[in-house]
Amino acid sequence: MKLHELKPAEGSRKERNRVGRGVATGNGKTSGRGHKGQKARSGGGVRPGFEGGQLPLFRRLPKRGFTNINRKEYAIVNLDQLNKFEDGTEVTPALLVESGVVKNEKSGIKILGNGSLDKKLTVKAHKFSASAAEAIDAKGGAHEVI
């Protein structure tokens, strides 16, 4: 096979369907929009959530709760994720982001006690669960709230 003999796989290249170009194409005249009506008009159509005049679902259901503008969301790191670091490492939020353990810091890092810790580490984070702090100290490491 030579370069000039290359062809795309069968069925992989499909020409787009041009509507309104004659009755013989199968998509002429009304261009697949049916006859008259709101959806046949240019720019026509109903807004999202519109149910034809029936009271829409979002208005039938009661309002509930509120959004706390002061809410802080912490990036969560479990103990077993800290095992990837060498013994004696100082684990900081910057190191966690750099090594890909967390994608971004959000409002801070919280260390939780899921899994087991096998290394002696100095961990600096914004929050610790009681079990996580206990496990870090039990291995001879240290935890520091920043």
Swiss-Prot record:
Q: What does this protein do?
A: Binds to the 23S rRNA.
Question: What superkingdom heads the lineage?
Answer: Bacteria
Entry annotated with the keyword Ribosomal protein = yes
Which family is this sequence assigned to?
Belongs to the universal ribosomal protein uL15 family.
Q: Which GO terms describe its cellular component?
A: cytosolic large ribosomal subunit
Q: Which organism is it from?
A: Staphylococcus aureus (strain NCTC 8325 / PS 47)
Q: Which GO terms describe its biological process?
A: translation
HAMAP family in the record: Ribosomal_uL15 (MF_01341)
According to the record, the residues making up region (Disordered) are 1-54
Q: Where is the composition biased (Gly residues)?
A: 42-52
| PROSITE patterns in UniProt | RIBOSOMAL_L15 (PS00475)
Assembly, per entry: Part of the 50S ribosomal subunit.
Ranges annotated as biased composition (Basic and acidic residues)? 1-18
Molecular function as annotated in GO? rRNA binding; structural constituent of ribosome
The answer on whether this UniProt entry bears the keyword Phosphoprotein reads no
Q: What is this protein called?
A: Large ribosomal subunit protein uL15
Any Pfam family: Ribosomal_L27A
Alphabetically sorted, this entry's keywords are: Ribonucleoprotein, Ribosomal protein, RNA-binding, rRNA-binding
